[in-house]
Amino acid sequence: MVQTAWDADPDARPVLRWLVTVRRAGAMTPAALMVACHLRWVADDMRAGADGRFPVVVEQSAVFLPEPPAGEVAWWVTTGHAARLVQAGLGLRLDVVDDAWLAGLPHELTDRRIRTGVLEELVAWPAQTPGFVKPSLAKVDVLAAQWVPDIAVAARLALDAGAHPATSVQVSDVRLDLVAEHRVYVLDGRAVASSPYLVDGASWEPGWDAASRPTETSAARAFAEAAVASGPSPEALVVDVGLLASGRWVVVEANAPWASNPYGCDLRLVVDCVVAASCGRPASRWTWSADAHEAAIASTMDPLVAR
């Protein structure tokens, strides 16, 4: 892989009153879990995971959002919807794994070199340099997460199609040959829920859960915990891990619980992680801010506002 400026410093990286704890002593119970997403199954999953412990307030129209109740609320919200909520003046305080987290993991946990930067920088890469390119966190329709034969060409095509030049991206130099991938929810350093979501090229379907592949589940959870223990991490995060054809495990990526598909994970524990990452969070290295691409789109749309 070519040396870039990114290599200079790789380490620079319904209202309820307060109730009893959600997951452990001292944990916060939200006044409500706000779900801003047009997908009905997300709302159904969050209601099931809340399990009557607090209200779940859902808005699927992507136009109006009910007024949040008094007190601290938790969120399940896509990053695009979150950008629109910020535009409306709602002070979201959400934890997310930053760009440097994955890139800073030891090589033995990733099996590849990962660099972070912004999309426009990729245009200057040498011709015919292949690599795996993906947006760091945002969902960018014109920039799919995929292996490309020429990074610079892929970047130019995405920019020509409307991607924001300052879109945060990750680039890696190895195409992973994965036979299985598992999503693992980690809370306070412990893997609390997991599910396979890709097995032998087949995507998740109902019935796949932690019990479907018990040996893999145990190994995936232990590996995710090791990754989180290797350095600073948010209190709650989602770690996707993959099993190589060689039998080794690698970290595929990391995501925010408040914007992740739970697949076949235990929904009650998923919601515990959502609450931990989105309710009453202090400002920190992990505080989410809208990616340039989604912020630009949000600026052209009516903000999500309370009725």
Q: Residue locations for each model-derived region?
A:
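Short, low-complexity, intrinsically disordered N-terminal peptides in bacterial proteins
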Residues: 1-14, 299-307
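Active-site nucleotide/adenylate-binding loops and adjacent lid/helix of ATP-dependent enzymes
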Residues: 2-3, 7-9, 18-30, 39-226
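Residues at beta-strand starts and edge strands
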Residues: 14, 180, 235-237
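Nuclease-adjacent, charged terminal/linker segments that flank catalytic cores
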Residues: 35-36
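Conserved metal-phosphate-binding beta-hairpin within the catalytic cores
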Residues: 192, 233-264
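A long amphipathic alpha-helix within ATP-dependent nucleotide-binding catalytic cores
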Residues: 198-248, 273, 278, 295-306
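C-terminal appended segment following the main domain
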Residues: 255-307
